[in-house]
């Protein structure tokens, strides 16, 4: 369940979906939107050295329309009866996860449906789900500040436990090089 725009990335995605035989019934095409993407180009010269260039972001800067939002919610309701787990990747400020869509996802979780949520900006708004923040997202959801820079391992564990209690959720917090 997602949306693609009417741009070249959307056309590439459609081609990949079609060639792989993927069911596209719940992929909404929105011609006036960008297909969101975070691209991490890898650079390699004549030597064997390979390194990552700065990330290229293709993002929308306006919310989806109410019509698209309604279609997302309709599709969410349709698929929930045919899947065992809903994995939510809420990574863009102006992606398909609006407050109304998130409320629908939370309602599914509260009804006993298994929902796993990973959100760059809104992890603290998901309740009754399995949450997968990184240490910074978890810290911000609990303390709403930038104090994570000086935090140690134990403080991150405490933040994850507080988030779990506050949101009635199981939390799997990734800790970069320190694991999860």
Predicted regions and their residues:
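Ribokinase/PfkB-type carbohydrate-kinase core domain
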Residues: 1-180
